[in-house]
Amino acid sequence: MTSQLIKKIVTGDEIRNAFLKFYSEKLHKIIPSASLIPDDPTVMLTIAGMLPFKPVFLGLKERPSKRATSSQKCIRTNDIENVGVTARHHTFFEMLGNFSFGDYFKREAIQWAWELVTNIYQLSVENIIVSVFHEDEESAKIWIDEIGIHPDRIVKLGEEDNFWSSGKTGPCGPCSELYYDFHPEKGLQNIDLEDGDRFIEFYNLVFMQYNRDQNGKLTDLKFKNIDTGMGLERMAQILQKKQNNYETDLIFPIIQKICEIANIDYFSSDDKNKISLKIIGDHTRAVIHLISDGVAASNLGRGYILRRLIRRMVRHGRLLGITNEFLPHIASVGINLMQNNYPDLKNNNDLILNEIKIEEIRFRETLERGEKLLDELISSGQKLISGFKAFELYDTYGFPLELTVEIAEENSISVDVKGFEEEMNAQKERAKAASSNIDLTLEGSLEREIDLFNKTVFNGYNSLLSEAEIKGIFLDSTLVKQASEGQKVLIVLDQTTFYGESGGQVGDIGTIFSKDVEVLVDNVMRKKNVFLHHGTIKKGILTIGQKVKTNVSSSNRAKAAANHTATHLLQSALKLIVNESVGQKGSLVAFNKLRFDFNSSNPISKDQISKIETLVNSWIMENHALEIKNMSKSEALEKGAVAMFGEKYDDEVRVVNVPGVSMELCGGTHVKTTSELGSFKIISEEGISAGVRRIEALSGQSALDYFSDRNALVNQLSDLLKANPNQLFERVNNLQSELINKNKEIQKMKDEIAYFKYSSIKSSAEIVNSFSILVNQIDGLDGNSLQSAALNLTSHLGNKAIVILGGIPNPENRKLLFVVSLGDDAVKIGLHAGKLINEIARICSGGGGGKPNFAQAGAKDIDKLSDAIDYAKNYLQKTLDSHSDK
């Protein structure tokens, strides 16, 4: 035995570490967990421990070693409705695995699995049942003859249960699974592995030995592989002797925090509350890892999954009686629980908590209104929620369809999912029609044709001029053999000095030329590592195979390079002055400006902006020489290089280093020294979405032009205000003070006019059934003055006052204003100022509203003013007469 038993393994961390240590001693290379965002475009999230190795199994990528072992974080949402309901369903889980790439096979896999579970984890043989594929006699023989398992402990299952395949064709093979028996006293007769209360499958050994062709025929693979998976949460349940995975030390500390916030006890809670506690506990782990791996909440793809999980957490928190914001507190526990094994959680702590906080606040703002509408639908007694209503809940209130279905099912109501999808498709069509100006020519046939070309070699970092050969010509998205003068084309070359749009940096411009041909290139795009040069043929005929030269505009390349380096300096300055957790959310590096999007819940103050500009400009003046090197991604990250949050990188990366200032993974073009930037100026800072801010800035000549324009503006203002530039602030400040004083004088005059006008009409109030009614026209008063007049009249007339004023503030504008003010007794008999004023204003093609005792409105038809006043008088007369009759 190569692993010496020191103590009984119990905790989740001990289980994980023991697994990796055991296989490391068996010469397996320990591979760190891959991101939840997979390289595989066929899946949205990393759903299995073997997924990062799929290219190796398929022969598409070199194996990292002959043997590997890992603890891989995974997310699955296909059974989300079972999370919290069953003992073992999760969205987030960790899969322990050992892998062989053409090295050892069944015998070693089975022997080592047995050694691990019996010697290291110390499981009793009496608690272990093994399943094998019913045609896999080889595995059964190893279990019985070499391991010594009694045949009664082996269950033979069919292809559906014990045969793994990657699809209808391709690598496949039989499985052997290890089950834990919680009730061995029931004996070995008539074993039913589907009995979830008795058995739990905890270790799956996949023997990848065949290739299945289109006819279903199996042939032996040249290299046979091993792919295994052990659920960490399941093994923790077994070794910690818990009723379910949720009560293990991997999840239960999170649940305890929820109980603390909700002021409830887990073990004495009813089943409904326990389900909510488990759902929040499970989703917490998924959410913190998704955000840490670069997923942001949205209505699409992974972002939608994240948003859905957070919104389920908020709702189940409300079911537990939690009415205040609580998710960041829960997430903090999850981060502390897992950060030792996943350091990225600690590094991204602030970012994770901020994203969760913003999303929770956003959903809480609409949840109450949405739940109210949903409750009305449920309480109406109907047994089906229409697709239209379900879509309204989604579109207006942010309710994911799944949440509506979940709440409806809890109340034995169905949802018209098909109708919802029809509404969703209709909206997409409307959006598509509204965005018909978007260029979609890069899709369709062009997308398919791109696969015909090899990767374009980029040789433009150190040279702007180079020779090349034309490999492809696209005319209107169609691949053609030649194109002539005047036509707009997309050109594919074997190599190019043109930078293709990537990493936020725009594509280069310039010319592609030969003795007989000239093409003005106005943009360069990348598609699947193929550079597409967009341009107009100014001279000659282009043909496939033609030898040409590429010549990039040096001035524009220099501008882009300066702005790209400035972007790196800006990010470093933001980290130092605003928050170390600032991370890039997007960028634009253009010729004339740069734009940088970053995470921040608060606006950047003017003082901070000034400090950022000063710091960046100091780095520019210090004339730092940039160092650019290629190295392995792991080496770069160890040296402290900053990677864009959520971005995918190759194993070898390009590192742009401004010594002592900035170090980033970047494929863009840059200056040689920071002094080439000249100067740096931030021209705007704004919020573009929840938790994301945007800075636009200038460098080089663009910054100088900006300063020149501002200087010209200052000179114009100096001439206008007859003051030198140094006196402008004082001059404008004095003008503002004068303006404020003049406005006060004007308002005083308006108030005096209003007082005079309302004084002249206050005696005209009529008494109807003890109420003082005053309905009158007062022209020449603005909204504030008219309101003041109405309130003063109401105060003068007392609790039984009913004041309605209408007037034309300015005859030239041909607009009307109305005000209704009611005393307390008028409100008590049922009059409502807001409703009354709306009826009055409607006569004059207007509208308004307000409180029961005071309201205001505007209208357009001044010719109907007298009709509106007559209506008000008649309405009040009838209403008060009716009240008198009562």
From Swiss-Prot:
Q: Name one Pfam family in it.
A: tRNA_SAD
* Cell compartment(s), UniProt: Cytoplasm
Highest taxon of source: Bacteria
Q: What class of enzyme is it?
A: ligase
Q: Which cofactors are required for activity?
A: Zn(2+)
One GO term under biological process is:
alanyl-tRNA aminoacylation
| UniProt cofactor note | Binds 1 zinc ion per subunit.
Q: Which UniProt keywords apply?
A: Aminoacyl-tRNA synthetase, ATP-binding, Cytoplasm, Ligase, Metal-binding, Nucleotide-binding, Protein biosynthesis, RNA-binding, tRNA-binding, Zinc
Q: Which residues bind Zn(2+)?
A: 564, 568, 666, 670
Q: Which Enzyme Commission numbers does its entry carry?
A: 6.1.1.7
Q: List the GO cellular component terms.
A: cytosol
Keyword Aminoacyl-tRNA synthetase belongs to the record:
yes
Q: Per its UniProt record, what NCBIfam families does this chain match?
A: alaS (TIGR00344)
The Swiss-Prot or TrEMBL record describes its family as follows:
Belongs to the class-II aminoacyl-tRNA synthetase family.
Function of the molecule: Catalyzes the attachment of alanine to tRNA(Ala) in a two-step reaction: alanine is first activated by ATP to form Ala-AMP and then transferred to the acceptor end of tRNA(Ala). Also edits incorrectly charged Ser-tRNA(Ala) and Gly-tRNA(Ala) via its editing domain.
Q: What is this protein called?
A: Alanine--tRNA ligase
Native organism is Prochlorococcus marinus (strain MIT 9301)
The taxonomy runs:
Bacteria, Bacillati, Cyanobacteriota, Cyanophyceae, Synechococcales
